[in-house]
Amino acid sequence: MKAVLILGLLLLSVTVQGKKFEKCELARTLRRYGLDGYKGVSLANWMCLTYGESRYNTRVTNYNPGSKSTDYGIFQINSKWWCNDGKTPKAVNGCGVSCSAMLKDDITQAVACAKTIVSRQGITAWVAWKNKCRNRDVSSYIRGCKL
């Protein structure tokens, strides 16, 4: 019985850790999901954005006390506007998705939500992109990746 409990806890800890992508692994993944050039945004800009928001980590969350909302996952999808975490007051859930889906290793739903956001608001919806990527040479974010 103890062995089953320990195994269960180990499996739980694996799912809770999330995934921290390597640079080129994420670049290939985002390209495969069709983000390279999506709505005019280059792959290097998406890479800069995800580095600035989460350091390529699917498990990152950040609470925003002013809006009582939380940003989730590799793209830091906000619970007030884009996903439902069940606790953010007056949440809109523009992507029609649970915020917990933004924290998964499989970033399919996170990418779909990011596409929705950029389609409606443009890349400037992300503060990290405005502060760290806009009007900068972002080529280093994909340099060395065999794409």
Swiss-Prot record:
Write down the species. Bos taurus (Bovine)
Keyword Transcription regulation assigned to the entry: answer is no
Intrachain S-S bonds: 24-145, 48-133, 83-99, 95-113
The enzyme's main class, written as a single word, is: hydrolase
Q: Where is the C-type lysozyme domain?
A: 19-147
What is one Gene Ontology biological process annotated in the Swiss-Prot or TrEMBL record?
A: killing of cells of another organism
Q: Which CDD domains does this entry report, sorted A to Z?
A: LYZ_C (cd16897)
What family is it from? Belongs to the glycosyl hydrolase 22 family.
Report what the protein is called: Lysozyme C, intestinal isozyme
